[in-house]
């Protein structure tokens, strides 16, 4: 698994992944750090690469996939990856970025998971569908096999940890709706 982190620091993402894998709080991880280091080296390290990818181009992702043959690549945020070419509008550039990501997946027989922001229309919404993808008309949605929106109820002002998962597009088996 490769995680291209161009939104948050790669070290922060790595810590979250490790913490989720071990199902421990930050405090518990600190208390058990010496035991966890060996487990990390055996259970996670050989299978996870996290790249700090600010300024990375989609062409670099393509080259990496050709050389390293990963099974899964997360591109967080795919919208921020650079791409060659001249585009009249931002949505045209985004569509080409998503087309290229899809082609990378097909050529390299790997899953490419694109992470994208939702537009302001999704703010404080429970049901977030593909029409709410940021800065895209239909380009992003057209290239995706599955689109998962993560929403919430209630105001952003309150401490609300409940999230709602919405499958708004699913070419894999056709099912869509709330989980």
Question: Model segments located where?
Answer:
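Generic beta-strand/beta-sheet core signal
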Residues: 4-6, 51-53, 75-76, 115-116, ...
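Helical mechanochemical/support elements of P-loop NTPase systems and associated helical scaffolds
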Residues: 9-13, 33-36, 57-61, 74, ...
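Cytosolic-facing regulatory segments adjacent to core modules
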Residues: 1-69, 83, 179
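Phosphate-binding/switch region of NTP-binding enzymes
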Residues: 96-179
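Short, glycine/charged-enriched secondary-structure capping and boundary segments
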Residues: 16-19, 65, 87-90, 126-130, ...
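Generic hydrophobic alpha-helical scaffold/packing signal
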Residues: 2, 14, 18, 62-66, ...
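Flexible loop/turn segments at secondary-structure boundaries
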Residues: 9-13, 58, 80-84, 120-123, ...
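Phosphate-binding/switch loop-helix module in NTP-utilizing enzymes
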Residues: 48-107
